[in-house]
């Protein structure tokens, strides 16, 4: 995992095996191991088999309303299904990703909701269905004197060979709106920002 993420994930005090275990996890910015942002508590994983279908179950002390399940179906179509779950993260964790978050130093809460998410690969074509909603609550930054800046929702919806995105403002001094899509590895997004009256 460290190799795949180019060292951006740091595992410490791991217990168990690759099939079932837990670890302390931290995000590491490109600056190196001294720039670690630990995720509170431990992260747990467990592999199960439902007949011939493997399932990976992941949970985290800090952030998950219930375990997150990844189910892989093999055959003429390869399909990855992700269970419906609510996840809560403090925005301060984003500093562990490095620039630009370590400059912005955002604070607030990030809630992620997954609904019927499936990725299907058939005939070398990826199809996406389902929805992921990101709610950014009480966003603040050291670069802004306005606190909080606002509360925002980003919605990502799978629509076959493309994923559509929308951005809306629920409340706040900075009104943001936008829409876009990801299709054939090309991403476009148009957004508008204005101050509230």
Question: Which residue ranges define each predicted feature?
Answer:
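N-terminal type II signal-anchor transmembrane helix
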Residues: 1-3
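N-terminal beta-strand/beta-hairpin edge segment
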Residues: 9-103
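Solvent-exposed loop/turn segments connecting transmembrane beta-strands
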Residues: 15-18, 62-67, 143-146, 168-177
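Residues that define the transmembrane beta-barrel architecture of outer-membrane proteins
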Residues: 17, 37-39, 106, 148-150, ...
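Transmembrane beta-strands of outer-membrane beta-barrel pores
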Residues: 27, 64, 76, 136-138, ...
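Beta-propeller and related beta-repeat scaffolds in trafficking/envelope systems
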Residues: 34-49, 125-163
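Hydrophobic, aromatic-enriched interface-forming segments
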Residues: 101-139
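Extracytoplasmic/luminal low-complexity segments enriched in Pro/Gly and acidic/polar residues
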Residues: 158-197
């Amino acid at each position: 995992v460290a190799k795949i993420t180019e060292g951006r994930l740091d595992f410490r005090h791991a217990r168990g095996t690759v099939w079932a275990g837990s670890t302390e996890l931290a995000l590491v910015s490109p600056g190196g191991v001294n720039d670690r942002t630990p995720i509170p508590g431990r992260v747990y994983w467990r592999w199960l088999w439902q007949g011939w279908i493997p399932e990976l179950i992941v949970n985290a002390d800090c952030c998950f309303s219930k375990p997150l399940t990844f189910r892989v179906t093999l055959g003429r179509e390869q399909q990855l299904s992700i269970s419906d779950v609510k996840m809560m993260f403090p925005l301060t964790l984003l500093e562990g990703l490095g620039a630009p978050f370590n400059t912005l130093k955002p604070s607030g809460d990030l809630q992620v909701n997954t609904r019927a998410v499936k990725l299907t690969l058939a005939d070398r074509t990826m199809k996406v269905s389902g929805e992921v909603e990101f709610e950014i609550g009480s966003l603040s930054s050291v670069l802004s004197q306005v606190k909080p800046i606002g509360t925002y929702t980003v919605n990502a919806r799978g629509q076959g060979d493309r994923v559509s995105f929308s951005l809306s403002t629920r409340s706040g001094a900075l009104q943001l709106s936008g829409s876009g899509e990801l299709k054939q590895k090309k991403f476009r997004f148009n957004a508008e920002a204005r101050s509230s009256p």
